[in-house]
Curated annotation (Swiss-Prot):
Post-translational modification: One or more lysine residues are methylated.
Molecular-function GO term, any one: large ribosomal subunit rRNA binding
Protein name per Swiss-Prot or TrEMBL: Large ribosomal subunit protein uL11
TM helices/strands, residue ranges: none
Record has rRNA-binding as a keyword: yes
Family affiliation: Belongs to the universal ribosomal protein uL11 family.
Biological role stated in the UniProt entry: Forms part of the ribosomal stalk which helps the ribosome interact with GTP-bound translation factors.
Gene: rplK
Superkingdom: Bacteria
One of the record's GO cellular component terms: cytosolic large ribosomal subunit
Organism from which the protein derives: Exiguobacterium sp. (strain ATCC BAA-1283 / AT1b)
Length: 141
């Protein structure tokens, strides 16, 4: 018989830098998960993606065991890395902060495809371009 799920915990943690301090500790402590076990496993799985923020969905079962799935980094994080900026524009309609080439947007869209609700790379590109626009990043051909 399958284990019963008691809780789903969603977090965004820097790759390879999970530790028992907030936000990881309190979120997993409430669910009764072995925090150090999760941290070691997460850090081992994400050590090659250093510098990126990785969304993770942790499934906690009634016997306090857990499994987790790592997702692709948010489009905003990938766009900031591609543009070489620290943060997006506070006024994206008035003040543009950077430019990104369309081929870089395609690269990001292809990376994000498994997590996006898109049927083709072109529609995924439109989603990534929308994120860029809302951050004050201009897309160049």
């Amino acid at each position: 018989m399958a284990k019963k799920v008691s809780k789903l915990v969603k977090l965004q943690i820097p790759a390879g830098k999970a530790n028992p301090a907030p936000p990881v500790g309190p979120a997993l402590g409430q669910a009764g998960v072995n925090i150090m076990g999760f941290c070691k496993e997460f850090n081992a799985r994400t050590q090659d993606q250093a510098g990126l923020i990785i969304p993770v969905v942790i499934t906690v079962y009634e016997d306090r065991s857990f499994t987790f799935i790592t997702k692709t980094p948010p489009a905003a994080v990938l766009l900031k890395k591609a543009a070489g900026i620290e943060s997006g524009s506070g006024e994206p309609n008035r003040k543009k902060v950077a430019t990104v080439k369309r081929d870089k947007v395609r690269e990001i869209a292809e990376l994000k495809m498994p997590d996006l609700n898109a049927s083709s790379v072109e529609t995924a590109m439109l989603m990534v371009e929308g994120t860029a626009r809302s951050m004050g990043i201009v897309i160049e051909d």
